[in-house]
């Protein structure tokens, strides 16, 4: 089942560039920075807003959900994209704006794959809500499996 044939996730694993390296240069995608707050403070993470850096936790601006929808409108007008993701700069689930954005995106662009990343701490609380909003893919960052190491981080 190498190609995920028969899987209910086959469409996503074939089309989403995070799960299929062959799609990296073929699938247009947009990441929108609508989630500035985080629910943990990791020693290695410095959230920042600037135009100079390109790394996790840094963005050139924070978008309000309506601005993010306008951005997706603009990007889809320029060329085809199939994926829109919320990836910070904080934790997606620690921000009500994430849910507002996905609700609006579902109404304006229902065919796009909706994805997000999270540290997962709030996932049990919000998993049903994400499903109701049509979020197709959730990436959970795992920084440690040993609780002692996690405390150091």
What are these regions (language model features)?
Residues 4-9, 18-63:
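Canonical Radical SAM [4Fe-4S] cluster-binding loop centered on the CxxxCxxC motif
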Residues 47-140, 144-151:
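Conserved Radical SAM active-site core
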């Amino acid at each position: 089942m190498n190609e995920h044939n028969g899987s209910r996730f086959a469409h996503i694993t074939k089309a989403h560039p995070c799960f299929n390296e062959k799609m990296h240069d073929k699938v247009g995608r947009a990441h929108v920075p609508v989630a500035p707050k985080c629910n943990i403070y990791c020693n290695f993470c410095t959230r920042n807003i600037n135009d100079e850096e390109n790394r996790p936790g840094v963005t050139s601006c924070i978008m309000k959900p309506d601005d993010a929808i306008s951005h997706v409108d603009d990007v889809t007008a320029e060329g085809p994209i199939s994926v829109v993701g919320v990836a910070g700069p904080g934790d997606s689930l620690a921000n009500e704006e994430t849910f507002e954005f996905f609700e609006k995106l579902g109404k304006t662009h229902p065919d796009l794959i909706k994805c997000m990343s999270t540290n997962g701490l709030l996932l049990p609380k919000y998993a049903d809500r994400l499903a109701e909003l049509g979020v197709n893919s959730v990436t959970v960052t795992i920084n440690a499996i040993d609780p002692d190491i996690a405390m150091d981080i």
